[in-house]
């Protein structure tokens, strides 16, 4: 069971973890390096479809998605602390695997690669924290809780916003239409669908 008090509380029960040994500090440093590597991982969908410089990175996407998650979760009355953690973690495995698009690999193979990568990254953290982060990340992958379902929709909403950003920079709508279509198809939350509809007008 995940370590939040109950469904109505956004608080976690963890005692402070002090890094008393040099090897622990080195492990944390290794974790931070993986986080930083996301700045150099381009979002593969843009890379394949658009011929432009300075493509959005996975780190760019994760930050925007996290801010959107914080606001929209508060508006929906969900567990915002959990969804913010989930948003920060949801693409972390891509620091090792790269951004794998759904049509480039079988779904089970993609899940397996990302599962292995996430465990490799999290092994640098104290055990209880690593276990919690993996469970939150896995909750997103399974997509059965309210927070995970909302975040999947936000992930696509952020993609649509980024596509519109590129359109405003001069990229033709025709080149971006597949991204708008995907967002329209996969965003399930009605409030987010309204945001998307208003945004696209």
Over which residues does each language-model region extend?
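Alpha-helical, largely C-terminal catalytic domains
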Residues: 18-201
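Cysteine-centered motifs
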Residues: 9-11
